[in-house]
Amino acid sequence: MIDKGQMLSRHDFSKVNWGILAAAALLFSVGAALLVLPLLSSIDESQVITLLQAGAGTILLGCTLLALRHYLRPTLTYRLYEHGVRVFDSHHHKERFIPFEKIGDIYRFRGGQAFGGLFDVTAFRAGADQPWCTVFSNVAHSWRLADVIVDQQLQQRGPLALNALYQGGTVPFHTIEGDARWLWQLLLGKQQGTPTETLRLSATLLTTERGNVPIEQIRALENHPQRGIRLFDGQGHVLFAINYDSLLSADLFIALLEHMIHNRIPAYHNPAMTRPSV
């Protein structure tokens, strides 16, 4: 039996659900009052028609809000535990528990602070053959859930990845081409998007399809909302750049490189750690 630990929080439909229900109830009440008003008072025929039209329009608007609520309801909801995340799929009536240590790839799209996180998206999966679990802003406290998932990946996989680097191994990171199109597929529930490129990080080299970057040359890392992730040499020249949204598990990638830059891992001085990457 999997040890879930204590449940920490629930992440169901966000509070916008109650706002929509309250607004719909108010519209229905106002609409009903407008329809009943002509029956309770002596009003000119022209005014009666106006009131009936206004009442019908108000009720129709309330129905529109209820329909909007249906489409805004998240397919996946979550329970956050000490050792993982419990995922509820309301569409297929299934549930499963994903331990933090099993989370492989994490995708994050940052919509910008100007929108207050409304367009932020996070998705994670246990493996390349597993479906994506999406966390949109219509999930209650989605920002907290996403931050915990990323933080746990850093705590669980970070030490293992660093140990692999120290032992001369490589850590792969998948990237996505056409990230806007792939994000749209996630929004539509088509969660089988496949990364198209793999970066390989070792203690001595960052291997990409555009060329290799020696770790020894990297002196600084920038993670900017607009400019993305950029690696610089000692003269301030850009050695490598990639959009944050295009790199899966970008926070782990940043954490590993920052550790290697700040601690200057002497892998290139150790013959046992300079063998070619696998």
Regions picked out by a protein language model, each given a short descriptive name:
Residues 93, 109-120, 215, 223-235:
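Short acidic, Gly/Pro-enriched loop/turn segments at secondary-structure junctions
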Residues 99, 238-245:
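A short macromolecule-binding patch
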Residues 81, 86-88, 125-212, 216, ...:
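N-terminal recruitment modules of adaptor/scaffold proteins
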